[in-house]
A protein has these predicted regions:
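N-terminal basic, Ser/Thr-rich segments that initiate or prime the first beta/alpha elements at protein or domain
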Residues: 1-490
Length: 490
């Protein structure tokens, strides 16, 4: 294929849906704030908007095209300001497929192609393209990678080396979520409670003052009648939040499965829109295992990938803030499944050695020095402010106690280690390959130096920036063990 070809005609529909996704929230908020006008006037407004959107989508589609050759593909776009994007197959680092349910009968997918340019978003976005064309692109890309690996084997030195065996000869599914696991993931996702709270605050800003006053009066009257209303409202809020989380999880992670083939992880998921993400092993900088307080009680965990490049940042637009290798899995089978998926890392449960146990006061001293006097002073003027500050201080001390007691590390092999700490009440274990660490930083103060204490920070590439994995208030001998580990030749 060497001549210019337009995208699939369904691109027009996708352009319209994309525009609606951006404008519908403002339309709904406007209706809530001002109410409906005359029926014909409303119909005229919506009809005119739909016509303009359709015309814009058709014009945009007409000015979009692409060409595919054996050595590169070229994307042409732009109505007034013309743009020509030329991408060779050697520069393609990852290809992400997305397929809405209405695209399935037409054998059409959307593509996002990330290159070695290091942009914060995929360099190439193809709204709709036939699957046969995608297979052609993938064939050329694989051929280019094989040729590059054969001609320049030294460039592959930093990649994970996996011997060819029957295990990797075919792309077999290594792990797949059940519907029960998806629902369990939803009801244990504590972030959804904060999300609903933020949505309610946003809606309140755009509601008319009369509505807000009426709701406030009803709430105050109900609270004055007794605490039963508060309990009932709390239960209702939790039920709604869990239902919302379960629906969101089912839409996002339905038919979630992970497979491995030729040094590439493939993650598939999605109910209304199917996502297929291919991740080369050399792009994986590390692995994070997370357990919030609720999941720890239930004995389940989540596994995230730390990726270099910009593709995972695009996930925010899909309400998924990270790339999950295993959204939810029982602790009893966690490491056996990781070993099956990611065989070259030789995953095993780490034996964590604590490095800051008994030093909780160092973690909390500045919070105590600032918040405690403020809380005491506030009680003389605004008791409610003093209460909030005191509760915040107690919360901070509790998390610092947890972190200081459990922060630690484990040396897994000659080239890998695990660092454990707590982010509030969530346990985080970060598995790091020595070759992926960009730099090591040791910091201290004159006071801490006299106590033989310092902080250690390991920097990894994450997205287009850096991830700092920190260990705080470590003894000098523990820091020396880590620095010797990184200085030792493989």
């Amino acid at each position: 294929m060497s001549k210019k070809v337009h995208y699939h005609p369904l691109t027009i529909l996708l352009h319209i849906l994309s525009a609606l996704k951006a404008w519908v929230p403002f339309i709904v908020i406007g209706i809530i704030r001002n109410g409906f006008k005359d029926g014909w006037e409303t119909l005229l407004i919506f009809g005119g908007a739909a016509t303009l959107l359709s015309m814009w989508a058709c014009v945009k589609y007409f000015f979009e095209s692409y060409t595919i050759d054996a050595d590169k593909m070229v994307i042409y776009e732009g109505i007034i300001r013309k743009k020509e994007i030329e991408v060779t197959y050697e520069r393609m680092q990852a290809i992400k497929q997305r397929q809405w349910f209405f695209l399935v009968p037409f054998h059409v997918v959307s593509l996002q192609i990330e290159t070695a340019g290091g942009e914060s978003k995929p360099e190439v976005n193809i709204p709709a393209i036939p699957i046969r064309v995608f297979n052609e692109i993938e064939h050329y890309r694989q051929h280019a990678n094989d040729k590059q690996e054969k001609n320049f084997p030294e460039q592959q030195a930093d990649e994970a080396v996996i011997e060819k065996s029957p295990l990797y000869e075919e792309q077999a599914v290594k792990y797949q979520l059940t519907n029960r696991q998806i629902f369990l993931f939803g009801i244990t996702d504590l972030s959804v409670f904060m999300g609903i709270f933020v949505v309610l605050l946003t809606i309140e800003r755009f509601m008319s003052k009369e509505w807000v006053d009426e709701v406030a009066d009803v709430t105050i009257s109900a609270v004055q009648t007794g605490g039963l209303f508060v309990v009932a409202f709390g239960i209702l809020f939790m039920v709604v939040a869990m239902l919302f989380a379960m629906i969101k999880s089912m839409i996002t992670y339905y038919h979630f499965k992970v497979s491995y083939f030729e040094k590439t992880l493939t993650i598939e998921r999605g109910l209304l829109e199917k996502h297929v993400q291919k991740i080369p092993l050399n792009k994986v900088q590390g692995i994070r295992i997370k357990q919030n307080i609720l999941r720890r009680l239930l004995g389940i965990s989540s596994v995230e990938l730390i990726l270099a490049g910009g593709q995972e940042q695009k996930e925010n637009a899909d309400n998924t803030a990270k790339v999950l290798l295993l959204p939810i899995i029982n602790e009893s089978e966690l490491y056996s499944v990781l070993q099956m998926i990611y065989a070259d890392w030789q995953m095993a449960k780490p034996t964590i050695q604590a490095v800051s146990r008994g030093r909780w006061f160092y973690f909390s001293r500045w919070s105590i020095a600032v918040l405690l006097p403020l809380a005491i002073i506030s009680f003389f003027f605004y008791w409610w402010l003093g209460t909030i500050l005191l509760l915040g201080l107690l919360f901070g001390i509790a998390t610092d106690l947890l972190n200081s007691h459990n922060q630690g590390l484990a040396f897994l092999s000659e080239s890998r280690l695990c660092i454990q700490n707590y982010q509030y009440f969530t346990k985080v274990q970060t598995f790091i390959d020595r070759a992926k660490v960009q730099s090591i930083e040791e910091t201290s103060t004159p006071f801490l130096y006299r106590k033989d204490l310092a902080h250690l920070s390991l920097q990894l590439r994450e997205g287009n920036g850096c991830l700092n994995v920190k260990l705080r208030y470590m003894k000098g001998k523990d820091i020396q063990r880590v620095t010797r580990f990184f200085r030792t030749a493989v």
